[in-house]
From Swiss-Prot:
Name of this protein: Thymidine kinase
Source species: Enterobacteria phage T4
Gene this chain is encoded by: TK
Keywords: ATP-binding, DNA synthesis, Kinase, Nucleotide-binding, Transferase
Enzyme class: transferase
Record function comment: This thymidine kinase is one of the enzymes that catalyze DNA precursor synthesis. Although tk is a nonessential gene, some strains of host E.coli do not support the growth of phages that lack this gene.
Any GO BP: thymidine metabolic process
Amino acid sequence: MASLIFTYAAMNAGKSASLLIAAHNYKERGMSVLVLKPAIDTRDSVCEVVSRIGIKQEANIITDDMDIFEFYKWAEAQKDIHCVFVDEAQFLKTEQVHQLSRIVDTYNVPVMAYGLRTDFAGKLFEGSKELLAIADKLIELKAVCHCGKKAIMTARLMEDGTPVKEGNQICIGDEIYVSLCRKHWNELTKKLG
């Protein structure tokens, strides 16, 4: 039985690398995969999933108004798809998460979504919130704080190291993101008042 799986972690835990390795395992066995990523993710490449360890793969772009279920039906008509992979799934819209679950339930094809759980302010992303609610299986990858403890939070810093307290939830640009344990994240956010 296929499942909708959400693999989540703070920044720099290897989410994209895990996705690319899992997709490679399918392809190595002669199976076809569908790799997707939201259009808003342009940091490393517009049309590829790129891992910080240097591996990458071409991806299909998801726009905010795209019906992923309909796109899957079109792609499936071209070739049998054995697994769907979604990088940066936190950026999905609620309805798009439900479209992923429809792929699982209608076609019995596994969907593996990877992303952040929370933003720099500790708030759930829309896509992550829905995935946490309806995924069949949740997997947490471990990121490491500078103190050596498990990092579950992400902080946003300006290039000069100044922490950011407020702002848009999604910001791809001059900011730097660091993974922190809850203790160090709380200490950082308290400094901001």
